């Protein structure tokens, strides 16, 4: 009798363990992280508004890049990704910086944040592959001390290179550039997003990873562009019959704080279109601010620590359940500058298709 009872108890525990494993396998974990391109481009914007010569602004920007430890910061972010092990990572500001003798020949790579991050993840034994890449901008500007500085700005989707059950994969990967783009001092500044269908067993949903236009203090057209981009995103997704997850850097404060620089109607417009804002839903009353962890574009160049005052790194859902939402911060060692791996807090959410 005791042996029968022991066998029954063992079988019950085995079933519970199997059920728990199955439940764990039936969720998808997604992380969104703006990894900070190494400059807020404040010097360049000042030059475009006529506040300093453009070559001087380019020299300052390059000096800021040299001081921002892009390679080391990629390691800090990789450490957080390796700890969380999300199935998908949506990244913004994944930049490639190049220099050259002039703007027509700026071909020499100086910093490549994507290479740094993938290499660091591999070293940690948690490899990821590039599932989608959205080249948003590619512009070279003349300097004084350097001939030219070239920025290639990218949004990237990473997928974890690990077997899991039920079968997990991405399909229908698409790269999009918004029709609405910021015009600033003779430069066109585009923004973009990546979409994919995420499959888990016989379930699927659409993932849209976005980076909307940032605000420019004292320049209302930047907000108009951002609002138009968000509407274009919503219009594109409106015909989707599958559930939808939208994540990324929206540059719109979801807390609706009228005192912050990113006080725009975009987050509210997405809610009004029938989407649930995940952090607000799961952490009611917790502001969960994600930006900025430090300041940049200062003279002299420095990166003082800052308490975040707005929540712009977000998840929105339609027709799919978000189970959890947590924040991750890539803290640097004492005395390191900048004091964090990025000026943005990362957000990790788990979904059950």
Regions found by a protein language model. Give the residues of each.
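Bacterial N-terminal signal peptides that target proteins for export
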Residues: 1-9
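Bacterial N-terminal signal peptides
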Residues: 8-17
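N-terminal, active-site-proximal structural segment of metallo-dependent hydrolase catalytic domains
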Residues: 22-143, 147, 227, 353
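Active-site beta-strand/loop signature of hydrolases that rely on acidic residues for catalysis
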Residues: 30-35, 73, 77-103, 158, ...
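Surface-exposed cleft-lining segments at the edges of enzyme active sites
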Residues: 60-67, 175-185, 212-226, 254
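Short, flexible/disordered intra-domain loops and linkers
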Residues: 98-112, 219-222, 255-264
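A well-ordered secondary-structure block
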Residues: 121, 130-209, 323, 330
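Metal-dependent phosphoester-hydrolase catalytic domains
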Residues: 168-169, 235-245, 252-353
């Amino acid at each position: 009798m005791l042996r029968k009872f022991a066998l029954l108890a063992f079988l019950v525990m085995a079933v519970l363990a199997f059920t728990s494993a199955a439940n764990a396998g039936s969720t998808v974990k997604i992380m969104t992280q703006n990894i900070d391109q190494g400059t807020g481009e404040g010097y360049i914007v000042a030059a475009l508004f006529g506040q300093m010569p453009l070559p001087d602004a380019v020299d300052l920007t390059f000096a800021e890049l040299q001081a921002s430890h892009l390679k080391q910061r990629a390691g800090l972010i990789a450490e957080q990704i390796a700890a969380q092990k999300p199935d998908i990572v949506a990244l913004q500001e994944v930049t490639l910086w190049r220099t050259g003798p002039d703007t027509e020949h700026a071909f020499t790579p100086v910093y490549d944040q994507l290479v740094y991050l993938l290499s660091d993840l591999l070293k940690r034994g948690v490899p990821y592959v590039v599932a989608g890449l959205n080249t948003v901008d590619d512009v070279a500007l003349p300097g004084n001390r350097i001939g030219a500085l070239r920025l290639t700005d990218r949004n990237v989707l990473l997928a974890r290179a690990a077997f899991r059950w039920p079968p997990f994969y991405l399909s229908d990967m698409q790269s999009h550039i918004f029709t609405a783009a910021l015009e600033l001092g003779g430069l066109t500044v585009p923004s973009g997003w990546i979409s994919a269908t995420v499959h888990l067993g016989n379930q699927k949903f659409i993932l849209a990873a976005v980076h909307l236009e940032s605000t420019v203090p004292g320049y209302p057209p930047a907000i108009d562009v951002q609002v138009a981009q968000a509407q274009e995103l919503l219009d594109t997704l409106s015909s989707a019959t599958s559930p939808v997850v939208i994540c990324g850097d929206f540059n719109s404060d979801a807390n609706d704080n009228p005192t912050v620089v990113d006080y725009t109607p975009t987050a509210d417009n997405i809610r009004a279109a029938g989407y649930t804002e995940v952090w607000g839903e799961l952490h009611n009353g917790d502001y969960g601010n994600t930006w900025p962890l430090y300041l940049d574009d200062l003279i002299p160049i420095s990166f003082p620590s800052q308490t975040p005052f707005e929540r712009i790194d977000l998840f929105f859902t339609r027709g799919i359940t978000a189970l959890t939402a947590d924040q991750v911060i890539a803290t640097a060692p004492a005395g390191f500058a900048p004091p964090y791996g990025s000026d943005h807090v990362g957000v990790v959410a788990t979904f059950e298709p």
